[in-house]
Structures are given as C-alpha cells and as structure tokens.
Amino acid sequence: MAHPTQLGFKDAAMPVMEELLHFHDHALMIVLLISTLVLYIITAMVSTKLTNKYILDSQEIEIVWTILPAVILVLIALPSLRILYLMDEINDPHLTIKAMGHQWYWSYEYTDYENLGFDSYMVPTQDLAPGQFRLLETDHRMVVPMESPVRVLVSAEDVLHSWAVPSLGVKMDAVPGRLNQAAFIASRPGVFYGQCSEICGANHSFMPIVVEAVPLEHFENWSSLMLEDA
C-alpha cells in the first residue's frame, strides 16, 4: 500500500509487476549514467581552455556515438519486449471476470457463475469507517482467489475508461463496443487499490477499483454467499 511522501512504486503483488520494477531500475540506471556522462562532457567543454583542431572531423568519435547508443537501446528494448509478451500471456485462467465501466462506477460480472455480478460505487467520505481510504474505498470489492490466474474482460457502457490496479501491474482501456482483456495472478492475500485512469467526465476522480485477493476456500465461501443473496 502506498504511504505519504513515498517516492517509489507500490509493493508488487504479481510476478510481472516485480519484473516491471526491476526493468524500471535497469532503465533508470542507464539514464542516470548517460545523464552523468553528458553533464561531465558539457562541464569539461565549458571550463577547459584547450581546443582540438580535429574536433570538426573525427571518424572515430562518429563511430562511437553511432554504435554505442544503438547498443544501449538494444539493452533497454530486449527486457522491455520480454515483459510485454509476459503481460499479454493468458494461459488457462481459473476465473474470468467482466469489468464494465460506467459514468461513474464499475460493474463486475463473474462469467463462470450463473448469476454473480454487482455494481461497485465509491464510498462517500462521510460514510467511511476508521482506517478506510478517502476516494479509494468501494461498497463492493472485486474478490479473487490468490495464486490463481484471473482474466479480466474490460469494456465500457458509455465513454472511454481505463481499469488500472498498479500493485497488480494491470492497466487496460475500457472502450465502448470493444472487449479488451488483461490477466493477473495475485501472489499474496491483500487489498489492492486502483482507479479509472482515463479522463471520463466530471466524476472521473471518483471511480475507484478495489481488488481483494483471498485464499481459495474464502473465495468459495464468498461466492456462495453472493449467490444466495442474488
């Protein structure tokens, strides 16, 4: 969970998100080294009184500054492509949930069950219980079993939305008339918060997403209770 004055990302709750965090550190290290080198060269050029009469025509320098950036780009691109393919892989999901964006709430339908679905609205500030988070709590959470592949089918009823949960490394656009899909595996139990990440109107800021990952037996008990109340 994020906390005040935090500078880094949220703790990863999915293997692919852990890969994304490692890639972020990898890319940031390369950017830092390049920035340091450029700053040093600029400082040296401004402060030195020496000149090089061959500075306008140096084949060796041109070869270096052509090949070296290409190598650096490859070092960034290869791990990025690997993670991109991992994010698109959806192999034999144990549970499929349809998330539909509306102005301004989410509705969820568990397609593996005959009659399990609900709308999820933000809890108003005056109704929050002690310890709950303002603008992030919902009246109904999307409950999923932990350590199980979950597929989320994302679409929208009216305008563009985006279903995003940072801790799970998921962000998928909800486009009216189109069905997009994303997948995740919650590696630990917990409550993971997200929000609509596409500006969708006046109350865009009030479309929170709450995913609760629980052990399988707890999920079965929850689904049984929901089906009884339906």
From Swiss-Prot:
Q: Which segments sit on the Mitochondrial intermembrane face?
A: 1-14, 88-230
Q: What is this enzyme's catalytic activity, as reactions? A: 4 Fe(II)-[cytochrome c] + O2 + 8 H(+)(in) = 4 Fe(III)-[cytochrome c] + 2 H2O + 4 H(+)(out)
Q: Name one GO biological process term.
A: ATP synthesis coupled electron transport
Named from the GO MF annotations, one term is:
copper ion binding
Question: Quick one: which residues bind Cu cation A2?
Answer: 196, 198, 200, 204
Q: Which compartments is it annotated to reside in?
A: Mitochondrion inner membrane
Q: Entry's InterPro entries? A: CcO_II, CcO_II-like_C, CcO_II_C, Copper_CuA, Cupredoxin, Cyt_c_oxidase_su2, Cyt_c_oxidase_su2_TM_dom, Cyt_c_oxidase_su2_TM_sf
Cofactor: binding comment:
Binds a dinuclear copper A center per subunit.
Name the Enzyme Commission number(s) assigned to this protein.
7.1.1.9
- For the ligand (Cu cation A1), the binding residues are 161, 196, 200, 207
Q: Does the keyword Zinc-finger apply?
A: no
Q: Which residues lie on this side of the membrane: Mitochondrial matrix?
A: 46-59
What single Pfam family name could you report for this chain, choosing any that match?
Answer: COX2_TM
Mark the transmembrane ranges: 15-45, 60-87
Q: Where does Mg(2+) bind?
A: 198
Tell me the domain of life: Eukaryota
Q: Which residues form the signal peptide?
A: none
Asked whether the keyword Cell membrane is assigned, the reply is no
**Similarity comment:** Belongs to the cytochrome c oxidase subunit 2 family.
Q: How does it assemble?
A: Component of the cytochrome c oxidase (complex IV, CIV), a multisubunit enzyme composed of 14 subunits. The complex is composed of a catalytic core of 3 subunits MT-CO1, MT-CO2 and MT-CO3, encoded in the mitochondrial DNA, and 11 supernumerary subunits COX4I, COX5A, COX5B, COX6A, COX6B, COX6C, COX7A, COX7B, COX7C, COX8 and NDUFA4, which are encoded in the nuclear genome.
Q: What job does this protein perform?
A: Component of the cytochrome c oxidase, the last enzyme in the mitochondrial electron transport chain which drives oxidative phosphorylation. The respiratory chain contains 3 multisubunit complexes succinate dehydrogenase (complex II, CII), ubiquinol-cytochrome c oxidoreductase (cytochrome b-c1 complex, complex III, CIII) and cytochrome c oxidase (complex IV, CIV), that cooperate to transfer electrons derived from NADH and succinate to molecular oxygen, creating an electrochemical gradient over the inner membrane that drives transmembrane transport and the ATP synthase.
Name this protein carries in UniProt: Cytochrome c oxidase subunit 2
**What species is this protein from?**
Cyprinus carpio
